[in-house]
Curated annotation (Swiss-Prot):
Region annotated Histone H3R2me0 binding, chain positions: 330-334, 350-352
Designated name of the protein: E3 ubiquitin-protein ligase UHRF1
Segments of this protein annotated with the region Required for formation of a 5-methylcytosine-binding pocket: 463-466, 475-478
UniProt-annotated stretches for the region Tudor-like 1: 129-205
Region (Methyl-CpG binding and interaction with HDAC1): 382-605
Span list, region Linker: 293-298
Record remark on domains: The tudor-like regions specifically recognize and bind histone H3 unmethylated at 'Arg-2' (H3R2me0), while the PHD-type zinc finger specifically recognizes and binds histone H3 trimethylated at 'Lys-9' (H3K9me3). The tudor-like regions simultaneously recognizes H3K9me3 through a conserved aromatic cage in the first tudor-like subdomain and unmodified H3K4 (H3K4me0) within a groove between the tandem subdomains.
Chain positions with N6-acetyllysine modification: K396, K542
Post-translational modification (record): Phosphorylation at Ser-295 of the linker region decreases the binding to H3K9me3. Phosphorylation at Ser-631 by CDK1 during M phase impairs interaction with USP7, preventing deubiquitination and leading to degradation by the proteasome. Ubiquitinated; which leads to proteasomal degradation. Autoubiquitinated; interaction with USP7 leads to deubiquitination and prevents degradation. Ubiquitination and degradation takes place during M phase, when phosphorylation at Ser-631 prevents interaction with USP7 and subsequent deubiquitination. Polyubiquitination may be stimulated by DNA damage.
Residues flagged as site, Required to discriminate between hemimethylated DNA versus symmetrically methylated DNA: N486
Residues annotated as site: Histone H3K4me0 binding: C313
Reactions this protein catalyses: S-ubiquitinyl-[E2 ubiquitin-conjugating enzyme]-L-cysteine + [acceptor protein]-L-lysine = [E2 ubiquitin-conjugating enzyme]-L-cysteine + N(6)-ubiquitinyl-[acceptor protein]-L-lysine
PANTHER family, per the entry: E3 UBIQUITIN-PROTEIN LIGASE UHRF-RELATED, E3 UBIQUITIN-PROTEIN LIGASE UHRF1
């Protein structure tokens, strides 16, 4: 296993080899010291937001193959200065002589004085102001920006200070110095609020007929910001569009909010309730009981029905509205809770400035602070490796490193070939086969479900009863072995049963399930099984690959039956026959196709570099022995003669790859897709010097939907030349988002979206069946 270690500034990166999942953090620090020349006590290691501490293993932090760990170098602690050195370094500013207050001190002192002056502002009652006591007005809220109905309770002005001259201009207080004490009509429980004069105006009471509404006119209308089709609050609206048909009237405007912000092109639903904005002193003050405007309920669930329990606007646990003074609000979800409804109940309102309910509160005991040890994981404590008394280092196997990527182009229960994986594709390790989606389990030989069927299997020669004849083979079921103690394999110790994966593989046979075995009436009608051959099967079969794992195509179950195996126990046998249009990879046609597609052995990222570094480190001691003073000519000749034999056979010289040529039909379809001509030019350039697999990866990257992050299915090419799945774009339109998901370009949602058929045809040919499950 190997990982990457990178400094925080990103300037230096090294690969650390020869690691295990059970490698301790303190052991990792020693390896890092050899590469970065940083002492272990000066190293701070970070992985996925956690600081790695000594005593834990890489498995505890879930560090996987080729992951990156960040290194932060601590500054070495300097020794304290002596008394003489410290006195000699003191300057005049340090000693405090001849220097007044600093700029920060001045600003802070000035700020305190200003605050005191504001707190000492004196307000007194006055008869001035545009609106008098008991007059009904409209008041703008500082949170929503909407206008609410209210009544003036008191009017105050800023009192004159002794320093201000008593002039006529001072006697006539400006409107900015007027403060109104108001009481909301719809919210009497809020009591009296104090608002500035700029947020108060005369009560709107005149309904503007539809015929008198004009574009550019500023009116007051009802609008719901969260739910545009429902009744909401009253806002100032600038009319931008007016349209009338035989059956409907449409009014659009810009809804004005706080701080000159606005919502553009909003449709006003209630066109018969548009009100005129009253100007100051335009009409007589409104003192009598006016008619009330209709506003939307503050709670969309209970519609402000006080007799109806509601867990949204009342107590979130019991739904009761009683005892509001004994309710506390959560600062995260804004839900109310009775003190006595909480578990455990509270005796009083918490004095903390911020309080969180049990659902929103973060358990501080689960938070790992910097420098703390990890919390014990219940999941890892139940693993066989945690309870085993064996000292074997199981963390070096490639089956333990975990997947770095996952196949999402088709679901896990997909029958048939994986799109983009041709017959003859080779991988060095089983974990890579899992990442490609051909066979997802890391260790198990059969991937399937007992109520659905088997999707894939690996022929690795693990059972002595297996017989491989290439186009057909006899496969032995799983089970009947004691794998306790985290074993990977063992001898047959009991009879196999037709359950779990054995039953799943039997379901692929085109015949009703039978506990005594069955044979397919038409074996080609059975469910397909992907077959992967492993190099371990070479001891029993000549069709196994020389290295790694190889995908050999689609097979189908002809029959299955129980019989006594070589071990003396009952085993389930399955006869599978090949049913694939692509040629077998061991035939001449298959080898030619493999060479044509440029299919080569795939290694994990960083594997060849790690192998080369390992060989390089192995040769260093040998070279030191050659250059030693005690070495003789005979010794040198022996060392030189054995040198070539020590080189790894795995690092082989790459053969020259033939450039892949697209079929004529696909080339013509690419020419038809003129909207993506630039993308296709970049993708086709990879065919010149890269294998077919790189070409497919380029296609996936170029035509990935930005919404679902998958290869586009039923693609829609927008006018801004971006490709999105039709379902994703329709979902965006239903959410009233009419812009391109990639660049926010405004799209025409009035016309139906059209699928790019040439692009869809190409993708179906390159990735057949990739639309399964979508």
């Amino acid at each position: 296993m190997w990982i990457q270690v990178r400094t925080m500034d990103g300037k230096e990166t090294h690969t650390v080899n020869s690691l295990s999942r059970l490698t301790k953090v303190q052991e990792l620090r020693k390896k890092i010291e050899e590469l970065f020349h940083v002492e272990p006590q000066l190293q701070r290691l970070f992985y996925r937001g956690k600081q790695m501490e000594d005593g834990h293993t890489l498995f505890d932090y879930d560090v996987r193959l080729n992951d990156t760990i960040q290194l932060l170098v601590r500054q070495s602690l300097a020794l304290p200065l002596s008394t003489k050195e410290r006195d000699s370094e003191l300057s005049d500013s340090d000693s405090g002589y001849g220097v007044g207050h600093s700029e920060s001190d001045k600003s802070s002192t000035h700020g305190e004085g200003t605050a005191d002056g504001d707190d000492k502002t004196v307000w007194e009652d006055t008869d001035l102001g545009l609106y008098k006591v008991n007059e009904y007005v409209d008041v703008r809220d500082n949170i929503f920006g909407a206008w609410f109905e209210a009544q003036v309770v008191q009017v105050q002005k800023k009192a004159l200070s002794e320093e201000e001259p008593c002039s006529s201009s001072a006697i006539m207080a400006p409107e900015d110095d007027i403060m109104y004490h108001i009481k909301y009509d719809d919210y009497p429980e809020h009591g009296v609020d104090i608002v500035k004069a700029k947020n108060v105006r005369a009560r709107a009471r005149t309904v503007i007929p539809w015929e008198d509404l004009e574009v550019g006119q500023v009116v007051m209308a009802n609008y719901n910001v969260d739910y545009p089709r429902k009744r909401g609050f009253w806002y100032d609206v600038e009319i931008c569009r007016k349209r009338q048909t035989r059956t409907a009237r449409e009014l659009y405007g810009n809804v004005m909010l706080l701080n000159d912000s606005q919502l553009n092109n909003c449709r006003i639903i209630f066109v018969d309730e548009v009100l005129k904005i009253e100007l100051p002193n335009e009409r007589s003050p409104l003192i009598g009981s006016p008619s009330r405007r209709k506003s939307g309920p503050s709670c969309q669930y209970c519609k402000d029905d006080e007799n109806k329990p509601c867990r949204k606007c009342a107590c979130h646990i019991c739904g009761g509205r009683e005892a509001p003074e004994k309710q506390v609000l959560c600062d995260e979800c804004d839900m109310a809770f009775h003190l006595y409804c909480l578990q455990p109940p509270l005796t009083c309102v918490p004095p903390e400035p911020e309080w969180y309910c049990p659902s929103c509160r973060t358990d501080s005991s689960e938070v790992v602070q910097a420098g703390e040890k990890l919390k014990k994981s219940k999941k890892k404590a139940k693993m066989a490796s945690a309870t085993s008394s064996s000292r074997r280092d199981w963390g070096k196997g490639m089956a333990c490193v975990g997947r770095t990527t996952e196949c999402t182009i088709v679901p896990a229960n997909h029958f048939g070939p994986i799109p983009g994986v041709p017959v003859g594709t080779m991988w060095r390790f089983r974990v890579q086969v899992s990442e490609s989606g051909v066979h997802r389990p890391h260790v198990a030989g059969i991937h399937g479900r007992s109520n659905d069927g088997a999707y894939s299997l690996v022929l690795a020669g693990g059972y002595e009863d297996d017989v491989d004849n290439g186009n057909f083979f006899t496969y032995t079921g799983s089970g009947g072995r004691d794998l306790s103690g985290n074993k990977r394999t063992a001898g047959q110790s009991s009879d196999q049963k037709l359950t779990n994966n054995n039953r799943a593989l039997a379901l692929n046979c085109h015949s009703p399930i039978n506990e005594k075995g069955a044979e397919a009436e038409d074996w080609r009608q059975g469910k397909p099984v992907r077959v992967v051959r492993n190099m371990k099967g070479g001891k029993h079969s000549k069709y196994a690959p020389a290295e790694g794992n190889r995908y050999d195509g689609i097979y189908k179950v002809v029959k299955y039956w129980p019989e006594k195996g070589k071990s003396g126990f009952i085993v389930w046998r399955y006869l599978l026959r090949r049913d694939d249009t692509e040629p077998e990879p061991w035939t001449r046609e298959g080898k030619d196709r493999t060479r044509q597609l440029g299919l080569t052995m795939q290694y994990p990222e960083g594997y060849l570099e790690a192998l080369a570094n390992k060989e390089k480190n192995r040769k260093r001691p040998a070279k030191a022995l050659e250059q030693g003073p005690s070495s003789s000519k005979i010794g040198k000749s022996k060392r030189k003669s054995t040198g070539p034999a020590t080189t790894s056979p795995r690092v082989s010289k790459k053969s020259k790859l033939e450039p892949y040529t697209l079929p004529l039909q696909q080339a013509n379809l690419i020419k038809e897709d003129k909207g993506n001509a630039k993308l296709w030019d970049d993708v086709l350039s990879s065919l010149q010097d890269g294998p077919y697999q790189i070409f497919l990866s380029k296609v996936k990257e170029a035509f990935q939907c930005i919404c679902c992050q998958e290869l586009v299915f039923r693609p829609v090419t927008t006018v801004c030349q971006h490709n999105v799945c039709k379902d994703c774009l329709d979902r965006s339109f239903r959410a009233q988002v009419f812009s391109c998901p990639a660049c926010r370009y405004d799209l025409d949602h009035s016309s139906p979206t059209r699928v790019n058929q040439p692009l869809q045809t190409i993708l179906n040919q390159l990735f057949p069946g990739y639309g399964s499950g979508r």
